[in-house]
């Protein structure tokens, strides 16, 4: 037997407090070891045996803070420090239910009821049924730091904690019935008997309270310092806690025993462990279980104190602290929860299969799923009828049974006989025969399209709304979704020029939420907006306006062969909470997305977001003096005849709280966005009973088309102007609260337009069948006359005698596989009728103004779709007498949804103005003023103006329309040209010696306001000083490291090769730049670790040197900064004209999402490359030419950048000595010998 000291007093051990255990042959080391392996450490035969421990749910992250046996069923409940609750069935610890009760709070206590389980956290009380469904969650201002709870009756519960309130809670009404003040010490332990409620605080005091009134009856002082736990059984109250010893706080080895009859302290009980928790065994009234924080358990008998036997056990807590324990009502099992996340259970020796309760009810489990017969997937003879349907409980047939009228036999439609065959047919009895006119091909059956759809023959197949045999719709190639094919070199082998023959740069659609590419192109080609966003700059980290400016700068400089990515914009977009609330952020698992509603909501969101961001960045400037409120789409939707539920509760009172006034002051100011897209309106609410009138001004950024709901005549025609007018201004009756009447009263609400915008943004709606049916009817009315004319022209043509075999290209007769002879095809013409003319319901131009009565008047061109050019239509303005603020609007851009039967995508058709062509191509003044293009991600093609207003509503549906004020073109042209001139002056030439003064220098700002952070890891970093700012032509060596956000997705082809479906999504983690010349050559001046809020799948530590936690602002010791600020530094270096030296810089700049001209890049991977041979790694180049070994364990971007600079200097030396060719040859020969691996020695 060894006697070792088990106390926590490090200064000295009391001689009369010893711990005894049988150590066997192991020598005593003088202190308790938590990793002790023995279970029974007592002197007698064990009364309990240890069962197999289990790792609780979330145990790898959180400890088990509470365990409780169910009083009604054979279940053990567990709550952890992460707010998660799990139940286990019987001693086999089979998981039964698992659910989250709070996102972050610790589960402090668990109690079971007949109807479920109660889980108490720091600030809430959750009630859930045992199957995991929540019943209620109660929160109160009085619940600040709850610790324990106790059920006094089936419908009464008391809760307390480290606060001065004790809460009496009614489980039936879910209300607090009484609040008792318990003092500053709070109440951490609650117990009860038949007379009192015992409440123990952390100062060592136990208060005896009345069970009904909760008033204080008696007070007992247990320990001198802190009360740890106590238990009540019969007339005894036994406690454990902390006492002062030698001016230190130590665990008291004596259990204080109080007789509740006399309220006096009797003889204490000495234990051999450090008691932390204790509890009476329910079935044995005199036996007590005492538990230490190390997992030691001692069973103490309060009656037979003179008995020499010691019953002690050691629970395997994996070297961690024991946090909770509980005893079953049958005393056959005990459960312990520790900090390592494990649950240990011990069972009585007499009952190795313990029962938690003597009389437990059965636990409800899920119904067993019936097993279906196993059938081979290749068995084509298996009858499906052998799988029996469930028995019908009611009725005689299933709801899925088809009605009898749909079960008739329908045969294939017979092929119609050519009238020419019938006219030449001769009869011989019942049989007729005729010579073959050869006007039709073999094995063809005509398919007659049902009437009611908008479909007409078209020369280039644009109007073909039919479907192929496999169900895929036949649509033009330029509208189809183009899949980007990846190889082992990424997108370097992909020919983008095949899909883009223009001078414009496209956008890749490989990242999530790339559905907005169509809208991004429209915003870019809106000249006034592009100019404002290129000038915008603010200090907000995730500013969408700044990111749009960066993206527009890339689109200005990129070409068709180098499409851009909106990765940085989408990264900031995912962080905006409003975008997530509107459902605009999609994941890879998103399916069946309504793209029409999605892109319209995105249009409304981005306009309002830019408005708020530009206002925040310029709030110190002059503000708009009027009281203007930027309205949302819900306000514009109020112009519809169908008012939402919110309209019933509109109030005509303008009294608002101070918080609303502060919020309105933010959106009332006029910004550059509201000047471009804003339509000023006034909303007049007039109470019908008291004639009280309230007027509210607002600005509408996006207009929703409001279609009629109830039409008396189905053939009634509504033109576009009528629909637009009723959408902008309306009058209706609603139920609203009147302040004068003090009740809801009928109210007339009218909306009027007071000012027109420069750019009119229109959401077309069409997200339901009702609106689509209405628009189809209007489109059919427009095409009726054209269809009649086409039929007349076709009837006058005579069929060719040679039919399909005719080889003459100038034949004037009709052929079954050719157009009519009067048709003249044009390369990009989109014709909806044989004579090359189309009429559309959507006009290319219209005139809108405000008359003397303040009403909006919209006049559309009667020949808007008559085939005239857009320039001719704009010059022929209709008479607009009597109109104020009269403006001519021309269609600027359209967003369409394209559905080919297998997938849907969004495309945009944009009228690119002449100033942009001049900027890109430097065209002469004699060139056309504008040209229409279709933008389908990186596929861009020119189209005719008619195609922008041509829709089938089958596979091509309009989503958003943008109309521009025609008279603003001159202003836009001058603004754009001046912007181009400024941008050209901003980029210095190679001969310039100084940096431009009109560029914002972030390096100077860093000198004035140095970045805060831990610079211990950046001892070699020396920021740029004011006298060493980079100039045009200066060398800067750069390297970047990346982490993976989404892994790569591959598939195995039938030939066994692996194909990349989706590339991995990389994010920049570290950017390092070093000086390339001067006295400080090779010294880094920029070494930024990029903070990220997104989940990182793989840190790629072996290749990047980035470790978990380096990018987290809460734990990182690195020089963390936001991506936007590092991006601004790189952008400044690019604009100044520095030359970057690096290894694989093209991929680095692609992930960083910045465009760098090729003449500003020196890439060592290409310098030391022999044509038609492999690329050489930086590590091998450094070893071969410089004799240094790098990247031995992990990569370091500063080391890599410095190495590339040295390699470039060595390259210049070899070129000067004319030894480079031989050196390159030796490099590849040596690499092949060593298999391109650096030797270890």
UniProtKB/Swiss-Prot annotation:
Cofactor(s) recorded in Swiss-Prot or TrEMBL: a divalent metal cation
Feature: compositional bias, Low complexity: 972-981
Gene Ontology CC terms, in alphabetical order: nucleus; P-body; PAN complex
Region (Linker): 359-473
Annotated a divalent metal cation binding sites: 1039, 1041, 1148, 1200
Self-association and partners: Forms a heterotrimer with an asymmetric homodimer of the regulatory subunit PAN3 to form the poly(A)-nuclease (PAN) deadenylation complex. Interacts with Gyf.
Catalytic activity as recorded in UniProt: Exonucleolytic cleavage of poly(A) to 5'-AMP
HAMAP family tied to this protein: PAN2
Regulation of catalytic or functional activity: Positively regulated by the regulatory subunit PAN3.
Extent of Basic and acidic residues compositional bias: 655-666
Residue ranges, compositional bias (Polar residues): 626-648, 822-838
Protein name listed in UniProt: PAN2-PAN3 deadenylation complex catalytic subunit PAN2
UniProt free text on domains: Contains a pseudo-UCH domain. This ubiquitin C-terminal hydrolase (UCH)-like or ubiquitin specific protease (USP)-like domain is predicted to be catalytically inactive because it lacks the active site catalytic triad characteristic of thiol proteases, with residues at the equivalent structural positions that are incompatible with catalysis, and it cannot bind ubiquitin. It functions as a structural scaffold for intra- and intermolecular interactions in the complex. The linker, or PAN3 interaction domain (PID), between the WD40 repeats and the pseudo-UCH domain mediates interaction with PAN3.
Keywords: Cytoplasm, Exonuclease, Hydrolase, Metal-binding, mRNA processing, Nuclease, Nucleus
Disulfide topology: none
Listed Pfam families: PAN2_N, RNase_T, UCH_1
Biological source species: Drosophila melanogaster
Role this protein plays: Catalytic subunit of the poly(A)-nuclease (PAN) deadenylation complex, one of two cytoplasmic mRNA deadenylases involved in general and miRNA-mediated mRNA turnover. PAN specifically shortens poly(A) tails of RNA and the activity is stimulated by poly(A)-binding protein (PABP). PAN deadenylation is followed by rapid degradation of the shortened mRNA tails by the CCR4-NOT complex.
InterPro entries noted in UniProt: Exonuclease_RNaseT/DNA_pol3, PAN2, PAN2-PAN3_catalytic_subunit, PAN2_N, PAN2_UCH_dom, Papain-like_cys_pep_sf, RNaseH-like_sf, RNaseH_sf
Intracellular or extracellular location(s): Cytoplasm, P-body; Nucleus
Enzyme Commission (EC) number: 3.1.13.4
GO molecular function: metal ion binding; mRNA regulatory element binding translation repressor activity; nucleic acid binding; poly(A)-specific ribonuclease activity
Alphabetical GO biological process terms: mRNA processing; nuclear-transcribed mRNA poly(A) tail shortening; positive regulation of cytoplasmic mRNA processing body assembly
Domain of life, per lineage: Eukaryota
Predominant location: cytoplasm
